[in-house]
Amino acid sequence: MFLLYEYDIFWAFLIISSVIPIFAFIISGVLAPISKGPEKLSSYESGIEPMGDAWLQFRICYYMFALVFVVFDVETVFLYPWAMSFDILGVSVFIEALIFVLILIVGSIYAWRKGALEWS
């Protein structure tokens, strides 16, 4: 009826990868010291006491740089499976991937011209 035995490696990986984080949270909840007070409720900024309000605005160049990084990261995620099966797919998929890369190149040139990649 169900061919679950064909996917036993997948199910084992899924179960193990689900149990390990749950087990880690349970252990940290049991072993962690419980302390409530003003120190526990204060904001934490990379080991440094925050000066003034904790909700500071970052400069826009950080957001633009992160956005450009996410775009190229997603490009890598989409192009890697295509590159792995390049010989199987054919010419039409190659043309689609070429159009995709050209759109990303135009986007990167636009971001470069707008100054999104400069820190000054």
From Swiss-Prot:
Reaction catalysed?
A: a plastoquinone + NADH + (n+1) H(+)(in) = a plastoquinol + NAD(+) + n H(+)(out); a plastoquinone + NADPH + (n+1) H(+)(in) = a plastoquinol + NADP(+) + n H(+)(out)
What GO cellular component is one of the record's annotations?
A: chloroplast thylakoid membrane
Q: What's the main place this protein lives?
A: plastid
Its membrane topology is listed as: Multi-pass membrane protein
Name where it's found.
Plastid, Chloroplast thylakoid membrane
| Keywords, sorted A to Z | Chloroplast, Membrane, NAD, NADP, Plastid, Plastoquinone, Quinone, Thylakoid, Translocase, Transmembrane, Transmembrane helix, Transport
One of the Pfam families matching this protein, by short name: Oxidored_q4
- The answer, when asked if Transmembrane is one of the entry's keywords, is yes
Task: Give the top-rank taxon of the lineage listed in the UniProt record for this protein.
Answer: Eukaryota
Bilayer-spanning residue ranges? 9-29, 60-80, 88-108
| Alphabetized GO MF terms | NADH dehydrogenase (ubiquinone) activity; quinone binding
Q: One biological-process term from Gene Ontology? A: photosynthesis, light reaction
Q: What is its EC number?
A: 7.1.1.-
Is Nucleotide-binding given among the entry's keywords? no
Q: In UniProt terms, what function does this protein have?
A: NDH shuttles electrons from NAD(P)H:plastoquinone, via FMN and iron-sulfur (Fe-S) centers, to quinones in the photosynthetic chain and possibly in a chloroplast respiratory chain. The immediate electron acceptor for the enzyme in this species is believed to be plastoquinone. Couples the redox reaction to proton translocation, and thus conserves the redox energy in a proton gradient.
Quaternary data:
NDH is composed of at least 16 different subunits, 5 of which are encoded in the nucleus.
What family does this chain come from, according to its entry? Belongs to the complex I subunit 3 family.
Q: What is this protein called?
A: NAD(P)H-quinone oxidoreductase subunit 3, chloroplastic
Lineage of source species: Eukaryota, Viridiplantae, Streptophyta, Embryophyta, Tracheophyta
